């Protein structure tokens, strides 16, 4: 399997989901967010938190610095806000972009906190290390 696809594929796929959703004038299934204080920002936080979590694979598999991953997420969020300026019924908001940025950072932090310390191959972690002197 192509290593670049393994490292960046999940983030690219999720970025595609975000692009698709922001292409819609009204995102289905989100009307409940209208009744939640700052529900729109919560939606951005969750979507971009998932992007941050998928970007964390690059940190784990290629040692990409966190600052670079946050920058990638921030630039994607800015491009998504610009993209929304062409979608009827959508508008550009700096506050949405800030929610995107915070979401990426929180997603990276959560992925690091809960998954970075664990081995990627759970079977390998169950294999006991060889004993000294044993052949």
Predicted regions and their residues:
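Membrane-interfacial segments
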Residues: 59-63, 83, 87, 91, ...
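Membrane-helix interface segments
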Residues: 3-6, 28, 61-70, 94
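Membrane-embedded catalytic cores of phosphoryl/pyrophosphoryl-handling enzymes
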Residues: 58-80, 84
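Lipid-exposed faces of alpha-helical membrane segments in multi-pass integral membrane proteins
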Residues: 9-20, 46, 71-79, 102, ...
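Interfacial helix-loop-helix junctions of multi-pass membrane proteins
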Residues: 29-37, 78-101
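"…centered on the first transmembrane helix and the immediately adjacent amphipathic helix/loop
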Residues: 1-57
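Membrane-interfacial alpha-helical segments at the cytosolic side of multi-pass membrane proteins
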Residues: 47-62, 66, 102-115
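Short, intrinsically disordered terminal tails adjacent to the first/last structured region
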Residues: 120-135
């Amino acid at each position: 399997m192509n290593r670049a696809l393994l490292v960046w594929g999940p983030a690219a796929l999720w970025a595609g989901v975000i692009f698709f959703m922001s292409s819609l004038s009204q995102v289905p299934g989100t009307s409940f967010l209208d009744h939640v204080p700052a529900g729109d920002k919560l939606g951005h936080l969750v979507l971009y938190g998932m992007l941050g979590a998928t970007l964390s694979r690059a940190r784990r598999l290629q040692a990409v610095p966190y600052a670079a991953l946050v920058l990638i997420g921030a630039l994607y969020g800015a491009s998504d806000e610009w993209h929304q300026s062409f979608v009827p019924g959508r508008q550009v908001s700096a506050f949405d972009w800030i929610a995107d940025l915070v979401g990426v950072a929180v997603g990276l932090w959560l992925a690091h906190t809960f998954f970075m310390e664990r081995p990627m191959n759970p079977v390998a972690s169950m294999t006991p290390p060889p004993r000294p002197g044993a052949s």
